[in-house]
Structures are given as structure tokens and as C-alpha cells.
Curated annotation (Swiss-Prot):
GO terms for cellular component: ribonucleoprotein complex; ribosome. The keyword Iron does not apply. It comes from Pyrobaculum neutrophilum (strain DSM 2338 / JCM 9278 / NBRC 100436 / V24Sta). The keyword Ribonucleoprotein applies. The gene is rpl40e. GO terms for biological process: translation. Gene3D superfamilies: 4.10.1060.50. Keywords: Ribonucleoprotein, Ribosomal protein. Belongs to the eukaryotic ribosomal protein eL40 family. InterPro entries: Ribosomal_eL40_arc, Ribosomal_eL40_dom, Ribosomal_eL40_sf, Ribosomal_zn-bd. This is Large ribosomal subunit protein eL40. GO terms for molecular function: structural constituent of ribosome.
Amino acid sequence: MPITLDPEKLAIVMKHRFQYKICRECGARNPPDAVKCRRCRSKNLRPKKFKKK
């Protein structure tokens, strides 16, 4: 089922797939508003990389 046909479903998928932060030290996924990593407590976080096609 292609999701590209329905913009609402596409927005939901994009939010869940790309709106989070990655810890640069341990690689854990964190919520988008995180300041510290949930696993190693590092403050070295980056947003998830996203490429548009």
C-alpha cells in the first residue's frame, strides 16, 4: 500500500520515522526534545538525518 497517496498518512509516517535525536556516543534513539541521552547521559545529540527524494 503506497503511503504517498494520502498526505495525512505521509505526515504521520514522516514524524515517526525522522523526528527523533540520535546519540553520537552510543547510537541510542531519543525523543526530539531530549537534552541528554537516555542510555549514556551524554549531551552529544544530533537530529535524525533526512534526505528528500
